[in-house]
Each structure stands twice: as structure tokens, then as C-alpha cells.
């Protein structure tokens, strides 16, 4: 039965149990809840939408905001699988030694639109309050938002892609780790990113960034591991900070697509 297969996966993937298990299952009409409005969540949602019903819960008002990821793709043709030529124009792609620079906020906007058009239920301004195992499903209780959406969801599979916030007082989802499969990534460290006009880059006093990504809109992103090491005399147009993988190779659209594919294959 479907539920027996899903429960086994949740138990053995739980971080509190040191077991390894490989289970192959084919399912249809699944109810899947994904916690966190990340790019990983959107890619997972589009995959599982083909098998049933998927709901994404995001605390913030929009998915992917505030931006905390470099606008970077290594092989821009990968976008053709997800976006129209008109949408790709919005990304402002430009070739760099570190990869193609792009506007990450538009990557997230387009991916959200594509997921919604495929039938994924997306609930912003929504926080998970609790979850409990019932006889044949996991019940998820959430807050309500201004759209008067449901606050109770029954799921066969729950995946968490969200990262714990480091902001003091910030509300968090309330998760039961024994009922949730975490989308585990590599060890995360703090990163700082700043955007400045390309005509102002580089400054002679600028320390070498770990990533430099110019875009065709006349702006350049510079990213360093750790805290902000330098501020340009004219200031930044925009700054980003958050926790990301310590490996630069992990920080691209392509790398995220590959990690999601690997994660899905590990469950099926």
C-alpha cells in the first residue's frame, strides 16, 4: 500500500535514525506538501505534480524574496526547458569567466509562474503550525492568509527545503522531523553579495570576490564568503546575505537542477 511505503521512507530518512534503506516505489494521486519557497521547492513541485497534488508553503509574501543566491547559470540552454524566449530576455544573460550572469529574482518569478500554470498550489504568507501522523496520511495545520485558504492539508509525503532564519524574532515553520524528509544540501556558510554598476567595476581597492557575475542590464554582482569585506565609494545598488554552500560549484541554476534530480532518484 502507498502509505506503508511512504511511512518507511520517512522513518529511515529521519536524522535521528542511522539506517540506510533503498526503496523503489511508483505512486499516483499523491498529496505532497513542500515547505519553503525555494528554487528546489519549485523544481520538486513540478516533478510531483505529475503524480498528484502538490502544495508549497512559504512564510514570505513572495517566493525567492529577498534574494540570497547569485544570479548564475553555467549552461544557459538549460533555461529553454523551463522558460519561453520572452521570459529568458528578462533574465539579462551575459557571459563571464565565472559563468553566465542573470537576474535571479526573475528566475524565481518565472519558475513560480511556470509551477502555478502546471497546477501547483502555492501558498505565500503561510506558516506550518503543526503536523501529526494519522492512520493513512500526515495532517498539516497552517496559518491562514488574506486569501482565506485552507488551513488543513492531508499529505502522503512532506519535504522541507527551507533554511532556518538567522534573523532574531523571525517566525519559523513548526516541523516534526520524524514526519518530514529534509532536502539536505552541502554544509552552508555565510555569504555576502553586492550589486554595483558595471561601469564602476572593478575598483582597484576591491578584494577578489569568490564570484563576479556581470549582466546585460549594466549591473554586476560580486560575492564573497563571510561578511561584507568591502563597500564601494558610491555604495551598492543592492546587497544580499545569507547561508549558501561553501562550494562555488554548487551555486548555479544547473547545480540546483542536478541536486533536485539526485534527490528525487534517491526516493524512487
Feature locations, PLM:
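Methionine residue identity
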Residues: 1-3
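Short, Lys/Arg-enriched N-terminal segments with co-localized hydrophobic residues
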Residues: 18-29
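N-terminal Rossmann-like FAD-binding beta1-loop-alpha1 element of flavoenzymes
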Residues: 31-54
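N-terminal FAD cofactor-binding segment of flavoenzymes
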Residues: 47-52, 56-91
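Short beta-strand to alpha-helix junction loop
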Residues: 94-113
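Predominantly flavin-linked oxidoreductase catalytic cores and closely associated redox partners
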Residues: 122-233, 254
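A conserved FAD-binding loop/helix module that cradles the flavin
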Residues: 240-267
Amino acid at each position: 500500500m502507498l502509505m506503508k511505503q511512504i511511512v518507511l521512507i520517512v522513518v529511515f530518512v529521519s536524522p535521528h535514525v542511522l539506517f540506510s534503506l533503498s526503496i523503489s516505489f511508483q505512486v499516483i494521486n499523491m498529496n505532497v506538501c513542500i515547505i519553503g519557497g525555494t528554487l528546489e521547492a519549485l523544481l520538486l513541485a513540478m516533478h510531483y505534480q505529475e503524480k498528484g497534488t502538490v502544495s508549497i508553503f512559504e512564510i514570505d509574501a513572495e517566493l525567492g524574496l529577498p534574494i540570497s543566491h547569485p544570479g548564475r547559470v553555467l549552461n544557459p540552454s538549460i533555461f529553454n526547458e523551463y522558460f519561453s524566449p520572452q521570459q529568458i530576455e528578462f533574465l539579462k544573460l551575459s557571459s563571464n569567466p565565472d559563468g553566465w550572469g542573470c537576474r535571479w529574482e526573475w528566475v524565481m518569478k518565472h519558475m513560480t509562474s511556470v509551477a502555478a500554470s502546471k497546477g501547483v498550489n502555492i501558498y505565500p504568507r503561510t506558516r506550518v503550525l503543526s503536523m501529526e501522523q494519522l492512520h493513512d496520511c500526515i495532517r498539516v495545520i497552517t496559518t491562514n492568509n488574506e486569501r482565506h485558504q485552507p488551513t488543513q492539508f492531508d499529505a502522503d509525503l512532506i519535504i522541507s527545503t527551507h533554511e532556518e532564519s538567522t534573523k532574531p524574532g523571525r517566525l519559523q515553520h513548526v516541523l516534526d522531523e520524524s514526519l518530514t524528509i529534509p532536502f539536505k544540501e552541502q554544509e552552508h556558510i555565510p555569504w555576502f553579495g553586492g550589486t554595483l554598476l558595471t561601469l564602476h567595476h572593478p575598483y582597484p581597492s576591491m578584494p577578489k570576490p569568490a564570484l563576479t557575475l556581470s549582466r546585460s542590464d549594466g549591473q554586476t554582482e560580486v560575492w564573497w564568503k563571510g561578511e561584507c569585506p568591502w563597500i564601494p565609494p558610491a555604495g551598492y545598488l543592492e546587497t544580499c546575505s545569507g547561508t549558501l554552500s561553501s562550494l562555488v560549484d554548487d551555486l548555479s541554476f544547473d547545480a540546483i537542477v542536478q541536486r533536485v534530480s539526485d534527490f528525487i532518484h534517491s526516493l524512487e
